């Protein structure tokens, strides 16, 4: 197991070295060498995961014999290594043809291999120093990959923007590592986490170390995972090559969720920080989802979609559902990587048409005409509201009867209910001669998905965090006052149902308030289309700082 763990980050590093050595001799054929070693990396990562599960192994720590330079083999590192290696291999294969006409072809694969090695080192790092080195290298490699086209000024500008944001995100993690080392005297994760569990209330300079470190780690994750208001770099990195966008949105941007899970033994003692994670994640999810709706560029729309999904991932951590955040991370990585790699084909196909999708969905949303409903709306509405909730409750109760004793689980159930209802509400645009059969097929598919997701979710939770006491402690730390919690859930449910009812009235060309809020809607659309002016505010602040530095420079010359 030890040798396999070291092979996983070393194979991409070896690939980068071979690409550099043989680029002049092999030319563009050097890409096949990179793909071959990438395939071997996937095989080794898969074998390690299977071996870990099959032998019922326990987490192990392996060092080179120094204080740093160690790897940690546990469920989180094992499964993340396979996911990262797999996505990297897909991007490598896709890039062979996509980048063939671009300048710097061998250099691109060299950087891609170095990026893969950095991410694999991060997910397998066994101590604070190794983690910081890998964390820093990811930002550097991403800067060079985004600026692959050196002749494009927007690419260089937004690559530097990303680089600065990532450097700002590095600083809190460095401070957290220093605080943890100064307080507990250890940098390797097994020793560090055991000492934190033994003395979670330790302080340094009058500050609670665990809470302060968790807060700093959260700030670092916010910058890396594009949480509001540190999100502006993500949608503007689309000037880079599409394979880089796929790797970034499928793997690199997920680093925030990984780092929070890696420091779960710290967050379990930080109730207030978990609540902050939930609030920031919820705001990011809402802002990202709303901004996505007003974009007319497919890659930028996918970028804001990623922002929203990262918000959901951080929100799940804030609820104490750390394992679900990892599951979300993996599913989103595979899904979003596929969407980015296929975005070019979608643009190509769209050019063959007039750009107007002549279907009932377009008629309902854009032309504001009534959608034809074959069944009474009241029946459909009741079935849509009740059936998903019933299926979710039964599935979770069957798998884990104590599931509903945790507030975080209730919130997850709430969002699952909203998602299921949204799926059923969206089926009005499907073309089916028999609407009853269509509805039954949708309900059956939804049931299978939910039940499968429930079983997989609970099994995944038991795999990542096998200690039931630790899982319960995470949920307990994320809890709030029961009366406040019940009131918030009830209020949110009322708001959601009111929104659905407004959608129904809009589909009937009616409105509760008539046209009195037409100007408000137009203003709101303008605000959203300008992305809430956050990027403009940052530009203005940058100009203010530049002007202030110039004045300060002139003032210093006089003295």
UniProtKB/Swiss-Prot annotation:
Compartments in which it is found: Cell inner membrane
Main localization category: membrane
Transmembrane segments: 4-24, 33-53, 76-96, 106-126, 173-193, 202-222, 240-260, 273-293, 310-330, 375-395, 408-428, 440-460, 487-507
Membrane topology: Multi-pass membrane protein
Domain of life the protein comes from: Bacteria
Pfam annotation, one family: Proton_antipo_M
Sequence similarity: Belongs to the inorganic carbon transporter (TC 9.A.2) DabB family.
Protein name as it appears in the record: Probable inorganic carbon transporter subunit DabB1
Protein source organism: Halothiobacillus neapolitanus (strain ATCC 23641 / c2)
């Amino acid at each position: 197991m030890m040798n396999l763990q070291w092979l996983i980050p070393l194979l991409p590093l070896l690939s980068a070295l071979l690409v550099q050595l043989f680029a002049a001799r092999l030319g563009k054929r050097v890409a096949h060498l990179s793909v071959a070693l990438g395939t071997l990396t996937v095989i080794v990562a898969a074998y390690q995961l299977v071996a870990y599960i099959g032998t019922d192994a326990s987490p192990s720590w392996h060092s080179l014999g120094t204080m740093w330079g160690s790897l940690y083999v546990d469920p989180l590192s094992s499964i993340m290594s396979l996911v990262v290696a797999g996505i990297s291999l897909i991007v490598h294969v896709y890039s062979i043809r996509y980048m063939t006409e671009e300048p710097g072809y061998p250099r691109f694969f060299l950087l891609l291999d170095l990026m893969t090695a950095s991410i694999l080192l991060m997910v397998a790092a066994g101590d604070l120093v190794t983690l910081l080195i890998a964390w820093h290298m990811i930002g550097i490699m991403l800067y060079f990959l985004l600026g692959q086209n050196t002749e494009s000024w927007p690419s260089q500008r937004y690559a530097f923007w990303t680089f600065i944001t990532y450097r700002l995100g590095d600083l809190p993690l460095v401070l957290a590592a220093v605080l943890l080392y100064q307080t507990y005297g250890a940098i390797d994760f097994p020793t560090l986490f055991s000492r934190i569990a033994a003395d979670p209330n330790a302080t340094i300079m009058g500050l609670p170390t665990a809470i302060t470190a968790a807060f700093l780690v959260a700030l670092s994750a916010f910058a890396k995972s594009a949480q509001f208001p540190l999100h502006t770099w993500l949608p503007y990195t689309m000037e880079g090559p599409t394979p880089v966008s796929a790797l970034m949105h499928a793997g690199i941007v997920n680093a925030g969720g990984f780092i929070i899970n890696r420091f779960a033994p710290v967050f379990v003692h930080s109730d207030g920080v978990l609540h902050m994670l939930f609030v920031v994640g919820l705001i990011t999810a809402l802002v990202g989802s709303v901004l996505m709706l007003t974009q007319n560029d497919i890659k930028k729309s996918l970028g804001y979609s990623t922002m929203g999904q990262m918000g959901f991932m951080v929100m799940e951590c804030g609820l104490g559902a750390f394992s679900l955040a990892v599951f979300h991370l993996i599913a989103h990585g595979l899904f979003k990587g596929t969407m980015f790699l296929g975005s070019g084909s979608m643009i190509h196909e769209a050019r063959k048409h007039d750009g107007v999708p002549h279907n009932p969905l377009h008629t309902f949303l854009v032309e504001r005409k009534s959608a034809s409903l074959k069944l009474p709306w009241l029946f459909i509405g009741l079935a849509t509201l009740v059936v998903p909730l019933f299926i979710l409750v039964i599935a979770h109760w069957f798998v884990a009867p104590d599931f509903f004793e945790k507030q975080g689980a209730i919130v997850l159930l709430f969002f699952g209910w909203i998602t299921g209802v949204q799926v059923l509400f969206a089926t009005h645009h499907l073309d089916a001669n028999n609407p009853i059969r269509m509805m039954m097929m949708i309900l059956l598919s939804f049931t299978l998905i939910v039940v499968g997701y429930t079983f997989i979710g609970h099994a995944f939770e038991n795999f990542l965090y096998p200690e039931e006491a630790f899982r319960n402690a995470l949920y307990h730390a994320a809890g709030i006052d029961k009366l406040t919690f019940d009131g918030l859930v009830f209020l949110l449910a009322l708001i959601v149902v009111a929104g659905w009812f407004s959608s129904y009235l809009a589909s009937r060309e009616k409105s509760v308030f008539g046209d009195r809020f037409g100007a408000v809607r137009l203003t709101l659309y303008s605000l959203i289309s300008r992305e809430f002016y956050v990027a403009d505010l940052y530009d203005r602040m940058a100009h203010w700082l530049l002007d202030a530095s110039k004045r300060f420079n002139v003032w210093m010359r006089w003295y």
